[in-house]
Design a protein with these regions (language model features):
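Conserved acidic carboxylate
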Residues: 7
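Two-component/phosphorelay signaling modules centered on CheY-like receiver
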Residues: 10-35
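Acidic, metal-coordinating helix/loop segments flanking the phosphotransfer/catalytic sites
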Residues: 34-57, 67
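Conserved phosphotransfer cores of two-component systems
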Residues: 47-52, 81-88, 109-110
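Conserved phosphotransfer microenvironments
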Residues: 55-82
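As written
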Residues: 106-114
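C-terminal output helix
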Residues: 119-130, 134
């Protein structure tokens, strides 16, 4: 299983890596790639496309600095790009945004397989979310 995690907060990124490692500890050939920003994530995705490899799961923070050269304004745009170039990749957007309208807009425009609030889930619940998303369920 090949997983991409993108978050501009290194501490949160490392925590997510630990959670994902635990969630998929039985997975064969688990590979986790981390990116701290949209620019690095785009370069990583392009590299994987060039060598004909795909990510099985992308876990992406919504609020991140833009990568203007590729017109990636936030994690939502990054998620859309990832799904475009790797249509079989499952995606989860993490956000600290609490406004219902904005969450609805993310869900409708980006259409991630999972949408989670950073402040709203326990580790156990987050593990369940990403495991279910990989199995094809929506959250």
């Amino acid at each position: 299983m090949n997983i991409l995690i993108v978050d501009d907060h290194s501490g949160y990124l490392e925590s997510l890596k630990s959670i994902v490692t635990y969630a998929f500890e039985d997975a064969k050939n688990l590979k986790i790639t981390k990116s701290l920003n949209c620019e690095n994530a785009i370069q990583t995705i392009k590299h994987h496309v060039a060598i004909n490899k795909t990510f099985d799961l992308g876990i992406i923070d919504y609020i991140m600095p833009a990568y203007n050269e590729e017109e990636i304004n936030n994690g939502g745009d990054l998620c859309t790009y990832l799904k475009k170039v790797m249509p079989t990749c499952k995606t989860v957007i993490n956000t600290g945004i609490l406004e219902d309208f904005t969450l609805f807009e993310i869900d409708q425009k980006v259409k991630p397989d999972g949408l989670t609030l950073k402040s709203d889930l326990s580790v156990e619940d987050y593990i369940k979310v990403i495991q279910e998303v990989v199995q094809g369920k929506k959250f």
